């Protein structure tokens, strides 16, 4: 299941009678997120599920709120990681194009718009439009960190047509204005 791009984002818990260390290792190597032996406590299972989901949500929040957390941190499987790598690469290739949108992204990913929406939403809990904008802003943060460009230049490099809209989006995403972000990096 973890190798199938349609199901790779779903956490897998193995409930099994096999209790050997080798069986546990095989289960985890095959992509299981947890391995629970029978007989098991229902309370333990519920706590394990809640913990897996809470940890996944923390990773997603870190990904969307921190400019330097990469997309692959929210991948639950190799298939998700490959998908996110290709997605990020495709966006970065077109990042300076203001008219780059979900339709173009879906076409370049060889997916329908609805399939792309479902997949991104299931992995990152954001829409494809939000994902494109997030990648634009993360790239802007990296460029700001480099110190090689002015804020006005960066806004156009990452595909924004307006520096004021760029600053507003940057602040909404990361909690600081680009100018404040630059100051915090230098200090």
Model-derived segments and their meaning:
Residues 36-38:
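A Lys-centered signature of the CheY-like receiver
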Residues 102-131, 157-180:
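Basic/polar phosphate-binding segments, predominantly the helix-turn-helix DNA-binding elements
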Residues 88-100, 120, 124, 141-150, ...:
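Basic, amphipathic alpha-helical hairpins
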Residues 122-161, 183-187:
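Terminal helix-turn-helix DNA-binding modules in bacterial transcription factors
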Residues 23, 40-49, 61:
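C-terminal output helix
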Residues 8, 19-34:
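Alpha4 helix (beta4-alpha4-beta5 surface) of REC/receiver domains from two-component response regulators
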Residues 50-66:
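The C-terminal output helix
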């Amino acid at each position: 299941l973890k190798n199938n791009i349609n199901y790779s984002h779903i956490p897998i818990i193995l409930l099994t009678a096999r209790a050997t260390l080798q069986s546990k290792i095989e289960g985890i190597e095959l992509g299981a997120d947890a391995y629970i032996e029978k007989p098991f406590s229902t309370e333990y299972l519920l706590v394990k599920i809640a913990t897996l989901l809470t940890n996944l949500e923390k990773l997603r929040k870190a990904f969307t709120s921190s400019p330097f957390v990469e997309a692959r941190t929210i991948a639950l499987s190799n298939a998700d990681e490959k998908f996110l790598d290709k997605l990020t690469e495709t966006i970065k290739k077109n990042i300076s194009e203001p008219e780059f949108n979900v339709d173009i992204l879906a076409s370049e990913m060889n997916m329908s718009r609805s399939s792309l929406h479902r997949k991104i939403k299931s992995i990152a809990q954001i829409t494809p439009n939000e994902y494109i904008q997030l990648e634009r802003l993360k790239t802007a943060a990296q460029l700001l960190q480099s110190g090689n460009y002015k804020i006005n230049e960066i806004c156009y490099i990452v595909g924004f047509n307006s520096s004021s809209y760029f600053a507003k989006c940057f602040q909404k995403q990361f909690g600081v204005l680009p100018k404040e972000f630059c100051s915090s990096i230098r200090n």
